[in-house]
């Protein structure tokens, strides 16, 4: 049995049936399942997408520069992570958000070195 897992959630999955914005029911559903696994002793790392809020490549069609569009997509990922972490905490499980781009005090900075 594995003790550590990496879970990838698409941004669209956090947007409910429409796949846009943040759907509280979707966040609650995922959080309950994640909390149940964590309470059973599983260590879970979660990577969220941000496509429910903004997709960098689709920004090109709207006049956004590729690099700026990608940056907005990364911010969307952080927004989703903050939302999901709050719902996980509401289930009584510790949750932290990390970013390789310094954004303190919003989220903790991660640097593998």
Language model regions located:
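Ligand-binding beta-strand-loop-alpha-helix segment within the catalytic cores
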Residues: 62-113
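General structural feature for long, well-ordered alpha-helical segments within catalytic domains
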Residues: 1, 5-6, 26-33, 60, ...
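N-terminal active-site beta-alpha-beta segment that forms phosphate/nucleotide-binding
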Residues: 29, 36-37, 43-44, 48-57, ...
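Short, active-site-adjacent cap segments at secondary-structure transitions
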Residues: 13-15, 51-56, 104-105
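Short beta-strand segments
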Residues: 6-10, 48-49, 98
């Amino acid at each position: 049995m594995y003790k550590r897992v990496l879970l990838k959630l698409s941004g669209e999955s956090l947007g409910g049936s429409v796949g846009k914005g943040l759907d509280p029911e979707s966040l609650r559903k995922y959080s309950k399942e994640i909390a149940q696994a964590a309470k059973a002793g599983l260590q879970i790392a979660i990577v969220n997408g941000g496509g429910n809020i903004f997709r960098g490549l689709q920004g090109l069609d709207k006049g956004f520069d590729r690099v700026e569009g990608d940056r907005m997509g990364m911010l969307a990922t952080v927004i989703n992570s903050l939302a999901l972490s709050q719902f996980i905490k509401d289930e009584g499980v510790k949750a932290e958000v990390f970013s390789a781009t310094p954004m303190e005090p919003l989220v903790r900075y991660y640097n593998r070195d």
